[in-house]
Amino acid sequence: MDLFSLPDFDGHEQVVFGHDRATGLRAIIAIHSSALGPAAGGCRMWAYPSSDEALTDALRLSRGMSYKNAMAELDLGGGKAVIIGDARAHKTPALFQAFGRLVDALGGRYITAEDVGTSTTDMEQVAGVTPYVSGLKRASGEVGGDPGPKTALGVFLGIQAAVRFQLGRGLEGLTVAVQGLGGVGHPLCRLLAAEGVRLKVADARAELAERVREELGAAVVPVDTLLEQDADVFAPCALGAVLSAQSIPRLRARIIAGAANNQLARESDGELLMQAGILYAPDYVINAGGIINVAHEYRGGSTEAAVHAAIKKIPERLTAIFERARQESRPTSTVADQMARERLQAGRRA
């Protein structure tokens, strides 16, 4: 395998493969860009079928983090870590300590945090061996902790902005289909329900869907039919590549706005959404609430009010993207990519 010729290799600055025989750790850390600051992005633990697929995910996710941090106006670059393993069966404190040593060896070039398959508890183990970690448990009133609810808040505000732009109205009485009901999807459903939204939900873990049904009165639908449900907004909050040439024709919603990373299977899928008249909120713009929280925690000296003020800029950025895309007759994803690259390039010149 030639790493430098892989389709998802995008001039990444560094890719680190880590293995610890004693704990069974197999991890990849990808640093896409440090033009704006140290690379920051979460650590995902997933049972990848192969190391090639894990590498592809790390490359794509780290690039997305560069764009996310740039668009959120953070002084952070983009990186991501993936641990190959079943998060429900293979976690041990020693494994995350070994991962922490791998992070520490980079000397601050990469700052980690929790992501899919990892938690604040796991990050506490990492923090025992390296200072280059965020998303840690904090005392009441301190900035930090699980970034999921902050991601959900940003997505909620982004959905409001997309609905105003596309439909010219508020949320009450609309139907939102939410895919994935974990650490972001569930709190997002709470925020939507409080605004009078009708919820249709799906998750591969039936117990999570049932929990949301009992708490919020959501309609539970099979995972494989959610795209085809009558809904005003589709909010993907699980894994990526959900929007493709095969899935887009099945969509019934007029707006796509969710928390999942890398929602487009291919860059060209943004064009397909535009042709279908579907407004797409670029994932790394709408889901930046979590990394904003992580950044404020890591830098220190911040407040919850400052974090919320930064997250409340997300709808403004989305609206600017929507307006520019409409004026230029280009996909919102293309416009967002260009804006992110421009900020990264400016950082390299500085």
Predicted regions and their residues:
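Hydrophobic beta-strand scaffold residues
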Residues: 110, 199, 220, 279-280, ...
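Predominant activation on well-ordered alpha-helical scaffold segments within soluble catalytic domains
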Residues: 55-62, 93-104, 124-127, 152-160, ...
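Glycine-rich phosphate/diphosphate-binding loop of Rossmann-like nucleotide-binding domains
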Residues: 146-233
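Flexible, glycine/charged-enriched surface loops at secondary-structure junctions
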Residues: 69-74, 109-114, 168-175, 223, ...
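Rossmann-like adenosine-cofactor binding region
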Residues: 206-286
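N-terminal ligand-binding/catalytic initiation module
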Residues: 1-141
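Adenosine-phosphate binding glycine-rich loop
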Residues: 163, 254-350
